[in-house]
Amino acid sequence: MGDNYSTYLLDIEGTVCPISFVKETLSPYFTKKVPQLVQQDTRDSPVSNILSQFHIDDKEQLQAHILELVAKDVKDPILKQLQGYIWAQGYESGQIKAPVYADAIDFIKRKKRVFIYSSGSVKAQKLLFGYVQDPNAPAHDSLDLNSYIDGYFDINTSGKKTETQSYANILRDIGAKASEVLFLSDNPLELDAAAGVGIATGLASRPGNAPVPDGQKYQVYKDFETL
């Protein structure tokens, strides 16, 4: 069925990598770093410009606010910038590697036009795909898939993933017709929003993903080998 499309738009969490990666690896790494980051912040620190955008002067209140956003899974663009900054340190130091599914790695490598759309910042997306755990090599080895990806979109570039206009924005930016694009995600609200502009959709059904009510109304993909 994948041969019917020239362009693929992929979600990340629960689609190309386990949904547990964010909850069990990325989020704990971030929250562990927040107290030190906030308390040691100065006007000259690299992260000062990001923290100042929260407009909270008291450091204890700022720290509590950031951790609350994480706990409530708020898709805040400033939080996403801050997470990208901290995760960069983890990826570059070798402490974090992305467990992208082997079939997703193969899919990204063999398809001509692949784009990524995630609520995580574009910077965080590039880091994730730049430090992918190589499934065929020792644990310390990683793959860089960025050269195979044609573009990245987030809530700052395109809008919220549950809004139809966001997908219209992406179609405009990639210069594609809706009929040429297949969007894959584990979130039915995102699939419905994309379908609103005529984009074909596929529900990613990966281990650990939450059950989807009325899942039978979607084309379901347990892996990407058939695409």
UniProtKB/Swiss-Prot annotation:
Top-level taxon of origin: Eukaryota
Organism encoding this protein: Saccharomyces cerevisiae (strain JAY291)
MF term (GO), any: acireductone synthase activity
Function: Bifunctional enzyme that catalyzes the enolization of 2,3-diketo-5-methylthiopentyl-1-phosphate (DK-MTP-1-P) into the intermediate 2-hydroxy-3-keto-5-methylthiopentenyl-1-phosphate (HK-MTPenyl-1-P), which is then dephosphorylated to form the acireductone 1,2-dihydroxy-3-keto-5-methylthiopentene (DHK-MTPene).
Assigned protein family: Belongs to the HAD-like hydrolase superfamily. MasA/MtnC family.
EC number of this enzyme: 3.1.3.77
Cellular location(s): Cytoplasm; Nucleus
HAMAP family on file: Salvage_MtnC_euk
Involved pathway(s): Amino-acid biosynthesis; L-methionine biosynthesis via salvage pathway; L-methionine from S-methyl-5-thio-alpha-D-ribose 1-phosphate: step 3/6; Amino-acid biosynthesis; L-methionine biosynthesis via salvage pathway; L-methionine from S-methyl-5-thio-alpha-D-ribose 1-phosphate: step 4/6
Cofactor entry: Mg(2+)
InterPro entries per UniProt: Enolase-ppase_E1, ENOPH1_eukaryotes, HAD-like_sf, HAD_sf
GO biological process: L-methionine salvage from methylthioadenosine
Binding positions for substrate per the UniProt entry: S118, S119, K161
Catalytic reaction(s) noted: 5-methylsulfanyl-2,3-dioxopentyl phosphate + H2O = 1,2-dihydroxy-5-(methylsulfanyl)pent-1-en-3-one + phosphate
Assembly: Monomer.
GO cellular component terms, semicolon-separated: cytoplasm; nucleus
Class in the EC hierarchy, top level: hydrolase
Binding annotation for Mg(2+): D11, E13, D186
Name recorded for this polypeptide: Enolase-phosphatase E1
Cofactor note: Binds 1 Mg(2+) ion per subunit.
Keyword terms of this UniProt record: Amino-acid biosynthesis, Cytoplasm, Hydrolase, Magnesium, Metal-binding, Methionine biosynthesis, Nucleus
PANTHER family: ENOLASE-PHOSPHATASE E1
